[in-house]
């Protein structure tokens, strides 16, 4: 359907994994697409790009990059475990409005550019 946007488990994307990180990047893409439509720019296509840090065993973690064509895991490393802890903190702050994850996109689009 035109003008219908879906994120997360409800999408028709069949590739695993359906992660919270992927839903986050889908949401950012939906915001960008709606703003493009409001300003008369063309639709954009989401390529499935997402990244996330995950906990591993002990003091290690992994960093994962994925898109529709490939996935790559980096690690194990204590640095990636620290990144996961940091990302969690930023996520909860964004829900409280302390950190605005859409600010970059908003500034770009409201300044008149795609």
Positions of predicted regions on the chain:
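C-terminal auxiliary extensions adjacent to catalytic cores
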Residues: 63-114
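Rossmann-fold NAD(P)-binding glycine/threonine-rich loop
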Residues: 1-2
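A conserved FAD-binding loop/helix module that cradles the flavin
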Residues: 10-56, 63-65
């Amino acid at each position: 359907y035109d003008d219908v946007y879906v994120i997360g488990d409800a999408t028709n994307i069949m590739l695993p994994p359906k992660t919270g990180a992927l839903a986050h990047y889908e949401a950012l893409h939906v915001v960008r697409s709606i703003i493009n439509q409001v300003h008369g720019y063309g639709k954009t296509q989401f390529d499935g790009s997402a990244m996330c840090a995950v906990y591993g065993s002990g003091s290690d973690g992994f960093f994962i990059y994925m898109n529709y064509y490939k996935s790559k895991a980096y690690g194990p490393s204590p640095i990636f475990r620290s990144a996961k802890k940091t990302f969690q903190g930023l996520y909860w702050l964004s829900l409280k409005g302390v950190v605005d994850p859409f600010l970059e996109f908003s500034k770009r689009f409201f300044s008149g550019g795609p």
